[in-house]
């Protein structure tokens, strides 16, 4: 199972079987609209950003309440862009362990572009 399978439209039953929540929106359409008409550039590409603001935007995209993604820029640790964003087409896995012991697994695809602030 690879995140690139999701972007390429190869949504195998294996993802659903394993309990992953997948994006319900057209990732490429959101990416194109964000590139043409950007509305949010976020500085700071760390885990808190990916787990909270990016995940909330992902939910808004899933429900059709919003139609653009976020562009993230990093000004300190460029390695996060080079190793955690770009190799995975800017998608992330959000895994939450709930107090009941249930594990929630979600693919976050709301980040449409990742930049080093020097670019």
Residue ranges and their predicted role:
Residues 1-118:
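Non-transmembrane, aqueous-exposed alpha-helical and coiled segments at domain scale
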